[in-house]
C-alpha cells in the first residue's frame, strides 16, 4: 500500500497536481489498507442450526400411522411395530407383531408398513399419513417402478389398499421422529403373545417416548 501511495504521488507531481506531504504517506497507506480490507472482507456466516427431527402431528381430521421393524437374529424372528395418532398427538391405537425372519431388513420394514396400513383400515380411518424411517421403503411406495425389488409384491399389496382410503400419503422421517414405533418393534418379542394391540393407550415400555413426542410436537 505504501508503494502504491508513492507511485500515485509521483504521477500527481508529473501532472502538476497538488500532492500530500511525504510524512503523510504512511498514514494514507494505512487508511487505504483498512478501506480495502473492509470492502473485500465478508462477514463470517453464522453456523447453521441443525433441525433435530421430531414427530409432528398430522393435519386436522387426519391420522398418522408410524411403523418400524426390528430383527431378532437369535430367534430367527422379526418384530413389527405401529402406532396411530390423531392431529392432537393422542394415540388411537398401537400394535406389535412377531413374524418369522424375512430375508432382508427392507422386507421387514415393508411388512411393518403394510401391517400399519391394514390396522388403520381395520379401525376405519380414511385420511392417513403412513410414516416410517426406512427411506428405501417409502421411496418404493411413492414410485411406479417397484416390481423389480425383492419386496415389490408387498408394495403392490400396499398400493392395492390405497383406494380404500379417501386420502393416503407415504412419508419418510428420521429415527428420532419415529421413536414410539421403533420401541414397539424392538419390544415385540417381550410380550406374551406374538400379536398385541392397544386401543387409545400404549404399553408401559413406550410411555416415556410417547409422552416426549407429545410434548415436543407442540
Sequence positions of predicted segments:
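Primary recognition of RNase H-like, Mg2+-dependent phosphodiesterase/nuclease domains
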Residues: 1-218
